[in-house]
């Protein structure tokens, strides 16, 4: 057993048990897994000017160790140039990508209200509002999962979103195994349906990198 096989075995990713695995990455969810982490994968403290980010190349390499196909779903922000670069990077790393521009939904608030997450308020003829970014891929992932149903034995989801519960039930009824890799905030029913649940903290060193932040 080589190092890669040992790593997969320790995570519970047994190829004999799960057969052909297809992985579906909801990157809008994955991208924030370690946003508030202040410790590295070796449990040492990050420096003040450091933060953890998802490393798309490392993510692709990790998935390729156990998955026959890797698919990447991401809503890019037309207002942020780097956002589009994420989709380019994913494609270069061998992901089959499904992308669309992010939508911004107006949410009207009372006069003088301050957004908790620091979003700027705007005004139009109907009043004061904040813009909430929205880019769900539960429909696209579900359609692809069903369309490709006969090609895999196990469906691996990188997300803990409750929107995937119905899909999980469908896959289980069709004799497919269901793997969930997600952060601590996982919808409990989704976790219960999983044949294997892997906490994102257990793969931190395999899919994350340290980024130096600019001084204020």
Where in the sequence are the language-model features?
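Nuclease catalytic cores that cleave nucleic-acid phosphodiester bonds
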Residues: 96-216
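Domain-level signal for Mg2+-assisted phosphodiester chemistry and nucleotide/NA-binding surfaces
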Residues: 1-130, 177, 184-186
């Amino acid at each position: 057993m080589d190092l890669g096989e040992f790593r997969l075995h320790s995570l519970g990713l047994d190829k004999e048990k799960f057969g052909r695995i297809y992985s579906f990455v909801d990157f809008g969810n994955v991208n924030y897994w370690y946003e508030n982490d202040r410790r590295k994968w070796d449990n040492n403290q990050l420096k003040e000017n450091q933060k953890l980010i998802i490393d798309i190349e490392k993510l692709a390499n990790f998935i390729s160790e156990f998955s026959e196909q890797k698919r990447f779903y991401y809503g890019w922000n037309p207002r942020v140039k780097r956002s589009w670069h994420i989709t380019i990077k994913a494609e270069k790393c061998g992901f089959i990508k499904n992308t669309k521009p992010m939508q911004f939904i107006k949410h009207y608030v009372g006069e003088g209200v301050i957004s908790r997450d620091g979003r700027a308020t705007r005004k139009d003829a109907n009043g004061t509002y904040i813009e909430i970014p929205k880019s769900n891929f539960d429909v696209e992932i579900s359609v692809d999962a069903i369309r490709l149903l006969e090609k895999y034995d196990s469906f691996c989801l990188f997300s803990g979103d409750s929107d995937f519960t119905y899909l999980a039930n469908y896959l289980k009824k069709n004799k497919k195994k269901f793997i969930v890799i997600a952060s601590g905030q996982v919808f409990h029913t989704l976790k219960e349906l999983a044949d294997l649940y892997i906490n994102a903290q257990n793969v931190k060193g395999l899919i994350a990198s340290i980024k130096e932040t600019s001084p204020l």
